[in-house]
Swiss-Prot record:
Protein family according to the UniProt entry: Belongs to the universal ribosomal protein uS19 family.
Source species, domain of life: Eukaryota
Subcellular location(s) per record: Plastid, Chloroplast
Protein name (record): Small ribosomal subunit protein uS19c
Keywords: Chloroplast, Plastid, Ribonucleoprotein, Ribosomal protein, RNA-binding, rRNA-binding
A Pfam short name: Ribosomal_S19
Amino acid sequence: MTRKKTNPFVAHHLLAKIEKVNRKEEKETIVTWSRASSILPTMVGHTIAIHNGKEHIPIYITNPMVGRKLGEFVPTRHFTSYENARKDTKSRR
């Protein structure tokens, strides 16, 4: 028996907001906390502000993004380089 393919997850409130904006035919930023939602073809052309844990970062949705998750495009961590640590060890010598 083969496995059944499941439908992509999209939060209901996000889908409702997108349909509402599509009916208005106006461009406005949609704010969401749902990073786990998949990107559907109906979202193409919209700007969605995705929460990264601290603030909402606006992302413009294009065709190559369809099928991926919203959270993939907004990093949650900020990498601080190790250069400062290396400079300190050189000055101690």
